[in-house]
Each structure stands twice: as C-alpha cells, then as structure tokens.
Amino acid sequence: MSTLRESAYWQELWRERLPLSAAALGTGFSISLNMFIASVFVPAMQAEFGWTGAQISIAGSFGLIGLFTFPLAGRLADRFGSRRVMLGGVAAIPGCYLLYSFQSGALWQYYSIQALWSLFAVLWSATVLGRIAAGRLTLARGFGIALLLSAPAAIGAIAAPLLSELIDSEGWRNGYRALAAVSLGAGVIAAAFLPSQESAHATPLDQRPDREAMRAIFRSRAFRILASAMLLCNFGTIITGLQFAPMLLNRGTDPARVGGYLSAYAIAVIVGRFTIGLSLDRFSTRYVAALGMGLPALGFALIAGAEAATWAMLAGVALLGISQGAEGDIAGYVGAQFLGPGLFSTTFGLITATTSLAGFIGSVASGIVLNEGGGFGPFLAFLAVTTATGAALFLLLPRTPHSRSTNAPADT
C-alpha cells in the first residue's frame, strides 16, 4: 500500500470513529456476547435446580432456529437500516436475561426462554450491525469488520470474571438482572450514536423486493463459492467448541496443560481477526481468504499426528484459533466486496446460517465416529481434507472488483 493510500486508510478510520465506536459497543453486547458468559451461570443453576449437563445441552438445539432467523434479520437490516432492527434486539436480549432470573426450576421455562432467545436475539447481532463498517468504509473495510467482530470477545473477557464474582456473592438471579440492566444501557447508548440513513457515507438500503434480492445473491458466482467454501470449512466447529478440551485430552494432553492451550487459542483468535482484516484491505481477496481459511487444515493434521504436549500440538491449536478469528472477517468482506454493502446483512445472515448447518453436520459426524470407538484421530483427518478443499474454493473467486466502494453486485 502506497504512503498516500496508507494515509487515506487511517484518515477514513478516523472520520468514521464515532459510527464504528457505536457499532462496536453494540456488537460487544449483542447475541455474540452470550457465548463468552453463558457458562458462568450454569453451575449455580445446576446446584439449585438439580439439572444435568445433558438437560442443559438440549437447549443448544434451539440454535438451529438461527438457520432461518439470521437471514431474516439480515434482510430486515438491509431493507430498514441497522438501528431500527437493532432496537428490537435491545428489547429482546435484556428481556431474556431478566426472564432467566425468574426461573423456578421447571425445564420448560428454561427451554422456552432459549427458544425466545433464538427467535429474537438475532436482531441485535453482527449480522445487523456489520453493515455499518461494510458500507461506511472502503479502504479500511476489513479492519472495520474485524473491529466489530472482536468486541464481544473483549467485553466477554471483562464481563465473565465480574459476573462470576457477582454470582458468588449475590446469587445467579442478581447476576442476570445486573447483566440485563448493563446490556440495556449499552444497547440504548449504541443505538443513540449509530448514524442515521440520512447521514453522510451511510450504507445504502436495498429497497428491491426480497425475492429479487435473494435471486441476485444466489445467482452470484462469488456467493455460491463463499457458501460452499464456508460449509466445507466449518464441519470442525464442534472441535473448537464443546469438544475442544475433550479432544485435547483424547490426544494425550496433560489435563493441567489444557487451560494453557485454550488461552493460546483465544489469543490466536484475536491475532487472526486483525491480521486477516488488515490483509484483506491490502492484498487480493481470494488469496487472503484461501490462506486464512486453509490454516485449520494444517492445524487439524498437526493435532491428529502430534503427541501430547509438543510444539506441533501448540502450533495446531494456534492455527485453529487464527482461522476462527479470520472466518467472520472473510465472510463479511467477501460478501460486501462482491455483492455490495447494500446486501451485506442479507449475505452475512445466509453465511451465518450456512456455518451453523455445517456445525450441526460436524457434530453428528463426530458423534458417529466417537461412538465407533475411533477416537478423534480419524475425524481430525477428515476435517483436514474438507477444510483444505473448502479453502481451495476461494481461489475460484472472481478477481477483486476495481472499485472497493461499489454497492452493486460485482459478478454474476
């Protein structure tokens, strides 16, 4: 990047500092925050109600509702703007936190709230707010998307220990009530400072009929490549989620070292998010995407063949983390780059649904392999192959559009 372009890059970020800060605050307290804090409440509720881990795990199946709600939320954001749609989530998420605090121990109450969460919390998500960075930034689009997607992890790192202390001293019900109050306040502040559609550099709304917009997306060669690649690259979501620690133990890792590996993974996620975001702004989209999403293939292979507590194991975990951080940047950037910022949220919602479907398929596949007694080794080898194949698909993307600010689809 030339000196002149580099200067314009940072000037653009400075110009959009208030909208980006508001969007980052909003994304930080959005639905994504829950993945970093939800488990803090579980032990206390189990102790009071006698719920088993299996009973709580069933609630995770409600996440499949997101296959339908994320694309819908994205389409609403593209039609009516991020702020209007987000306000629905600002009511829903604190409301669900408050409802959790009034549970009496009946599982149907817990499941009902989880269902409400899956239906309405998506209105306050990166799918809705990401279009602010995608549309208001042209030179620094990758960095802006990375900034928004990193906010939940940063806030979660602060909130989780504070909530844990509050639960220990005041009980889990007051923990949920405090969380409801803080998230409501953050949501209102973020919404107040989000730019209006009449402001300068506003992301254009997509006013065409929904059927026409969907037809444009699915006819796009870039979208078909992106969706196929993300599907293949995300079968391993279960490994970097619920099965991460069990997988490390299965590969012979000392239990005392598991925490260290998880910390290394978390650091790698943040590094990957900003590294890939900056790279997307400077280098060819297809090559950056192929490299960023291809790293886990090597990571899975290293872990599958590594012995316990080796540098190969640590390197494999780090590669998984870097790619996990890169995933959202790549999905958002490719969608905005080839379909235009006006369709960012619809496209991002569809890709989020695709990755959720991939995670579900991967969970079923891993269960079959583990039930056969093969351990994680064969499944890791399978993931290495599918991930490498998915990453290679990014090389088929059309050449990057000459104009980074175009709002019209760049390919057919």
Where would I find each of the regions flagged by the language model?
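Central cavity-lining transmembrane alpha-helices of secondary-active solute carriers
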Residues: S61-R75, S263-T275
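C-terminal transmembrane helical hairpin of 12-TM major facilitator-type secondary transporters
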Residues: Y265-V269, R282-V334
